Amino acid sequence: MARYRHSRSRSRSRYRRRRRRRSRYRSRRRRYRGRRRXRSRRGRRRGYSRRRYSRRRRRRY
């Protein structure tokens, strides 16, 4: 029984990870569509340096 429970939790975590990745891409797309609204506190805390670098690079262009 314990073994089944463990495998079940493992598959659940895997599904959650895939879903999280999808939501991240979706949020990224939404930011481009609505830059003013999009700016969410959760996205800002996650990968803040990466966004800053991309912004600097875009400004140079």
Swiss-Prot record:
Main location: nucleus
Residues covered by region (Disordered): 1-61
GO cellular component: nucleosome; nucleus
Cellular compartment(s): Nucleus; Chromosome
Family: Belongs to the protamine P1 family.
Record carries keyword Nucleus: yes
PROSITE patterns (alphabetical): PROTAMINE_P1
Protein name: Sperm protamine P1
GO MF term list: DNA binding
